[in-house]
Every structure is written in C-alpha cells, then in structure tokens.
Amino acid sequence: MANRIAAILPAAGFGTRMGADTPKQFLELDGVPLVQFTLRRLAECAEITDFFIPTHAEEAEALRARLKGQSTGRPVRVLTGGNSRQDSVAAALTEVPRDAELILVHDAVRPLVKREQVERVIAEARACGAAILGVPALDTVKEVKRASLPGDVALITATIPRERVVLAQTPQVFHAALLLEAFARARQEGITASDEAGLVEHLGHDVHVVLGSDRNLKITRPGDMELARFYLEQERASQGAAGGKR
C-alpha cells in the first residue's frame, strides 16, 4: 500500500504519579478510557492506515473487547507491551507492515491532540525524515544535580537559555526505515531514551520540531484529568458557537 502510515499508541504505563489504582491510560475521559479517546482523535487523520496499541498483558483482552465497538475503518491491533515505553514501542515495531512509509508514535494518555497538528507533523516527517510536536519553554530552565544534597533539594549547575529549549510532545513521526534503524542501534548498544526522537538523535539524524499546543497535554498527575475535561468542554463550546454562526 502506497504511503502507508502505522500509528503506535504505547499504553503499558503504570501511572504511579497519578496516585490512582487504575493505570492512567484506562482512566475515563468523556465516558471512555483515555486510550480509546486518544485512538478516536488519531483516527480523525485519514492518512493513518494502521493502529497498534501495546498494553499490559492482563489488560489486552479487555481492551480488544472494548475496541470492537469502535470503528476506525482501519486495522487496530492490541498487543502485549514491555516494561518501558521503549520496550513497548519495540514490540509494536515487530508488527508494523514492511511496506509502511512512516511510523507515528503518540502517547495513549495525550487525548486532546488535534487532527491539524497530526497532519502537520506527518507532512514535516515525510519531507525531512523525522519530526515531532513541541512547545516553547516559558519558564526559566535550570540544569541541576541532586546527588550532593539531601531530600528534595537540588543544586543548580547551569541556566539554559529558553530560546534553546522546547518541551517535546507527541506525535513523533519518522521514516519507517530510520526508526527501525534507531531501535536496532539502541538494542545493540544498550541505549535507552525517554522518547523515540532521542534514539533517532543518537544516530546523528536531524529531528525537526513542529509547533504543538499546551492543550495537547499528557495526563501525568491527578490535576491533569480535570484540566483535560475543562479543555474538552471549551473545545466543544467553541465548536457549538462556530456551528451556530453558519
């Protein structure tokens, strides 16, 4: 299939910072688990041809059953993830079709991404090989070391100019061969990174940043769910107002 784009939604995290018994990807937004809501959002991008969701082995069957009632019009495969994000994405990469042109990775707990953002980062990755969404850092950023002081106290070692800093978001999109090479190199050299762009950077390949949005938040702490609900209400109110003007 020409221009095939495979999307991976890592959903095997434990969400310890949320302080909830339920893994955060299964907390509900608008009456459905976050992972399902996020899948719906990504499916608004017609360019994506395949979806892969690595999750906990004990949650996989329940998620498959839940998704049976949701039609994306494209294949959705739930598979067993790993102990880390990197392991989960690696597991999904073994299932990605060999003829995929691009591979997109998006946090299952980043539910409010917009179709336009997805399309822009796909277009940039298609042109340059690797692109992610990101937002400028608004606060002053300090480099610190923590080992020298007790408790939660850290020592500042440098101030990083804000104009040199962006906060990485997802989707992160790559030429398929490039991402597969990055994961193969990481496996060979024992390299770990907190996102896919970090592994591609390790190859020496440039990664472009497309402007994202603060509303494309990652659900990490308890207050994030309240904020996501508020943003969703605002989004729907705005859509309703726009519809009323037609």
Question: Residue ranges of each PLM-predicted region?
Answer:
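Conserved core of the sugar-phosphate nucleotidyltransferase
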Residues: L112-V210, K245-R246
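SAM-dependent methyltransferases
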Residues: M1-I8, A12, R40, E44, ...
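Active-site nucleotide-sugar/metal-binding loop of Leloir-type enzymes
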Residues: D87-L102
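Hydrophobic C-terminal alpha-helix "anchor/cap" residues
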Residues: L39-A43, L67, V96
